[in-house]
Amino acid sequence: MASNDLETKHLETLDRDLGRFSSLEKATSYVAKPLVAPALALIFIIIVGILAATTLSGVSNTIIIVIAAVLGAYMALNIGANDVANNMGPAVGANALTMAGAILIAAIFESAGALIAGGDVVSTIAKGIIAPTSMQSVDEFIWAMMAALLSAALWINLATWVGAPVSTTHSIVGGVMGAGIAAAGFSAVNWMTMSKIAASWVISPVLGGDIAALVLW
């Protein structure tokens, strides 16, 4: 009888210890899980910076190029977290695509679109919104564009954190315009180009809604 009581106590103690271990494991998982994504993002940014530094070692303005690469990597992460989610959200929500399929399609076609047809958009962002000649020096223009890239990335990061879908285009165009005004005044901005861009922001959702309505007619 005493042996049975002792065995029962041992089992109860073992159950309590296993329960504590299970609770500790759950708590560790709960704390660590939110840190995985930021850690992977940081690793990606560091790798991009290292690759840029090693590839361009010995080139003039290497530091500026490395900083630009790091900011570009940070911006790319934010585009994936917010802008790509905007595009793929309806398809995933309608169960037309799985999350893995949506990510794969986004990775392929976002990259292909930028490489095949992104030149004109890059030119507009780089030279069409603010005139490089309005700056006192090339370095001033470079740092203005850096500031625009960083400000847009920070804003998209904040919007992603609060779960707000925002436009990368709006963010970077606003960043470039603001940086140009801060560096060289309102005269630095090409207001005709800005008017066309702003008009497209109004036309795009209306046109998209009309086309969607026609498809479902």
Regions found by a protein language model. Name each.
Residues 2-217:
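Alpha-helical transmembrane segments and immediately membrane-proximal extracytoplasmic
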